[in-house]
Amino acid sequence: MKKILGLTAILFALSSTTFAQENEGHEKVKVPTSVKNANMQKYPESKKQHITWETEKGNYEANWGGRDGEANSVTYTPAGTFVEIVKAIPVKELPASASSYIKTHYKKAKFGDVGRVLDAKGVTSYEVEINGKDVIFDKDGNFVKTEM
């Protein structure tokens, strides 16, 4: 009997932890239905993933996939209009000119995330997190700007 009660307690604890993790991000951010629906319509594969939501500059950002849960990061307006998707990529997939720029201007820099960005107009760019800032490059790897 003690074993059954012990197992029940352990299973309850594990299921509570799992439930809390599934709702992580939703407790702090109330995502409009229009935004959730837009994400499911545009990226139906995300339905099978654990999605975390956050707000950024008045918009909503859905994150899912990969080890850190942020292999895909999609931004929508509050009305559910697609703004952009950032897909995590390895550094070696950056255009050569972007890599060259980074080596020249950010010697011994600490790299963070590297992503390929596709915006609502179909324009591709790249962003590289370096020393806590986003360094933006165009589709050819030419430096565009640095964002905080």
What does each model-identified segment do?
Residues 1-23:
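Bacterial Sec-dependent N-terminal signal peptides
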Residues 22-148:
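Interaction-mediating elements
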